[in-house]
Amino acid sequence: MNRLWKITAVEWKLINREFITLFFALIFPVLMLLLFGTIYGNRPSEIMGGYGTVDVSTPAYTNMIIAVTGLMSFPLTLAQYREKKILRRFMVTPVKPVEILLSQFFVNILMTVLGLVVLIALGKVVFDLHFYGNVLEAIVAFIVILLGIFSIGLFIGGLSKNMK
C-alpha cells in the first residue's frame, strides 16, 4: 500500500506537468464560469425556471471537468505508457501494472475533485452560487458519473496502441 501512495505521488507530479490537463480541468471551466457569469449574472430568471444562470450552468462545467480527466487525461496517459513501453519496464520491478493503473485513477480523481472545489468555491464567492439539491444524492451521482466516465476512459486507453 505504501508503494501505491509513492507511485501516486510521482504520478501527481507528472500530471501537474501536463498543461492540457491542467488547463481543461482547472482553468477552462473557471474561465467559462467567469465569462458567462459576468455576462448573464446569477439573478433568477423565468427562462431558467427561476434559477440563476450560474446555478444552472455550473453542473455542466462540473461534468466537463469529469469528462476531461476521464476521457482525455486518463486514456491518453495509459496510451502514452503503452507507446513508450513504460508498463513493460515496470514488469521487471516489484511494481505491478495494477498499481500503475490505480495510481493513475487516483491522480485523475484528485485532479477532478480539485477542479470541482476550485469551480464551486469561485462560483460561491464571486456569483453567490446556490445548491438546490440533496448533498448526499449529489455525491452519489458524482461517484456514479465518475466511475462510468473513467470506465469508458479505461476502455479507450486499453484499446489504444498509441496516443494518436
What are these regions (language model features)?
Residues 89, 121-123:
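Residues within well-ordered alpha helices
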Residues 3, 7-84, 98, 104-116, ...:
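Transmembrane helix-boundary elements of multi-pass transport/secretion proteins
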Residues 89-96:
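Short helix-to-coil transition segments within interhelical loops
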